Amino acid sequence: MGAFDGLRALVTGGASGIGLATARLLTAEGARVAVLDLAPGAPDGSLVRLRADVGDDGSVKAAVSSAVDALGGLDVLVNNAGVGAQGGVADNSDEEWHRVWDINVVGTVRVTRAALPALRSSAYAAIVNVASIAATAGLPQRVLYSASKGAVLSLTRAMAADLLPDGVRVNAVSPGTADTPWVTRLLDRAPDPAAEYAALAARQPHGRLVSADEVAAAVAYLASPAAGSTTGANLAVDGGMDGLRPRHRE
């Protein structure tokens, strides 16, 4: 018997990385799962795959409606879709600021807004927003990305307060540097990919990148009925990066 038997879940950015790992785990635990993505992939029988652009309200409304119809309702929403950005405070144009904010922050709002009517009808409603350790740790050359994920974290707590009377729990997961396609693309652009990989791994106290499956496990815990008294929380999956200051070994 799975933790999500009989439940219906929607995962944005669900075609790769953390989103796909989450969708697969929820499915393995008994949920019926729909994924929304710009490139959702070919039907495979295990997931409902729908194309959606979280930057477009019409696209979001249509895709969420199709997902709810296909699943027969909705119990869990995972807001995972997002884009990255590099640079200091003077490096990103206004256009890039607006684009990243529109996807990472307003995109979360759009999907949640469209899904709320169905979630309010569920006895086990849960929303999990994927934030980032960049929201709290102060990483170099991540000003825009950090600001957007900090907003997601604040949004999570405000949503949790507003939706508590409706029985909808809202939590966040903050991954450290994760082994995902976005990080792979970042490494591909680096002058020395091996050195950049080593640097990214070393900044986590446990000395390696976080896996997508580890983040998915945290999402699944917060989304499950077993976490029924947990709302407004942020669960870091970062190898201790945000809170630990271990001594360096000689």
Residue positions per predicted region:
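Short, small/polar-rich loop/turn modules that mediate ligand/substrate recognition or access, typified
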Residues: 78, 164, 169, 230-232
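Substrate-binding pocket helix/loop in short-chain dehydrogenase/reductase
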Residues: 88-89, 93-101, 200
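Active-site helix of classical SDR
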Residues: 112, 148, 156
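Alpha-helical segment proximal to the catalytic Tyr-Lys
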Residues: 117, 161-165, 228
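Residue(s) in the substrate-gating loop at a strand-loop-helix junction
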Residues: 132
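Short C-terminal tail/terminal secondary-structure segment
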Residues: 137, 231-250
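C-terminal helical subdomain
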Residues: 172, 180, 194-230, 235-239
